[in-house]
Amino acid sequence: MEKILTVQELNEALKTLIENKQEFKDIYVQGELSNLTFNKSGHIYFSIKEQDAAINCMMWKTNAYKIQSLNLEDGMQIICYGRLTYYIPTGRVSFEVRDIQIHGIGDLQKIFEQRYKELEQKGWFDPNLKKSIPEFVKNVGIITADSGAAIYDLIRTVHRRLPLINIYLFPAQVQGDKAEIDITNKIKQANNFKIDLDVLIVGRGGGSYEDLWAFNELEVLQAIKNSHIPIISAVGHEPDWVLSDYVADIRAATPTAAGELVSKSIIEIKNQLKHYYQNYKTLILNKLDFFNEKINNYKKDQTKYIKDNFSFKYLQLKQLSIDNTKWTKNKIDSVIYKLEDYKHSINNSIIHIINSQNKALKNYLIADEQKILNYLKKQISEFNYTISSFKGHINQILKYEELSFDTLENKLNSLDPLKPLQNGYSIVTNLNHQKIRSYKQVKLNEDLKVILTDSKLTVTIKEVKTNEQ
């Protein structure tokens, strides 16, 4: 009698046969992607099919990171690499996928990797070649398609954050045949534009690997490298990397992110201006303190010098007077002993000589002291005049800077769309955030939002009256 197998035995035998067979361990299968599902556990489930056949596939989360940049969608032709597995409880054969390639992209990936190595060796990615974006941007050039969500999101982001920025659009074909030529020409056109652009955003929204390929072409990369305007590469989504991201001066994850990079909010600018003003004011005050201290030290040094010099001269004069007196007295005594008869005559002569010498020395001392005092007074007068002029100049600068800052602050405040709310006005919008300017935009019993200076209200239209009623 033939052996009868249980279902368990049959399935175990099939599992051993399928999973141990070498031909099913490392295989490549091409087909159309279908039923793509990203499970919250991190695993990915899908099918690959053709006209009359299909097989269920899974990719565990440990390998899921490999396909983040592929932007997979149902209907794509893909090539899966992995092995066959057999699940005993349901008797199902599945394809456990370890890696996925989009059909036809394999050759493009090889070109990408080879081109990356060549450009890296040539120094095209050197950080020292990167140009910096001005701190305050006024004129922005954008090279992208003139339709689609990317351009509208980018413009909306820039104008929301800083309405003063001027935007100049250079519409370009961003995918398909000859797209790289159009992008290259638009970069050159922007560099020769009649208005000096502060920064240039080159990019597009998301797409497949082939859709983004124009930004890997050498013509585009050479134009980016040669641009005298700083360039931000903003291609696709966060996981997407193209060669223009490496050659450009800055890479933005998305076009919207590029808009945030080039536009500072009004609040940021006001805070930065206040910071600059305080730093400048502190610097000037420190300079004034330094010069005042220097002046005081100079005055002290000059006073000490005069006092010391005067004391020295006085001691010199006193010693000279003492020496002369002793010499004269000895001379007189000698003459008295020898010439007693001429005592009165010689005594008068000596007194005359002493008076003459004392007078001469006194005149010398007075003249020398007066000369020093006059010189010092002149120096101090000139120094005080210089300091007075310097203080006046500094005060003028501070007044000018304060006036300029107040003027700029008033301009910024006038641009604040919420400023009128402080005067009792309000902003009315529907639930889709569209501003209500006329009764024609509303219906009875429709809910509206009213924005006040300190709160938001939700109201319902109960009655409509025009101003004429």
UniProtKB/Swiss-Prot annotation:
Compartment list: Cytoplasm
EC number: 3.1.11.6
Keyword annotations: Cytoplasm, Exonuclease, Hydrolase, Nuclease
Cross-referenced CDD domains: ExoVII_LU_OBF
Gene Ontology terms: cellular component: cytoplasm; exodeoxyribonuclease VII complex
NCBIfam families: xseA
Record note on quaternary structure: Heterooligomer composed of large and small subunits.
Family: Belongs to the XseA family.
Described purpose of this protein according to its UniProt entry: Bidirectionally degrades single-stranded DNA into large acid-insoluble oligonucleotides, which are then degraded further into small acid-soluble oligonucleotides.
Protein name stated in the entry: Exodeoxyribonuclease 7 large subunit
Organism of this sequence: Mycoplasma mycoides subsp. mycoides SC (strain CCUG 32753 / NCTC 10114 / PG1)
Taxonomic placement: Bacteria, Bacillati, Mycoplasmatota, Mollicutes, Mycoplasmataceae
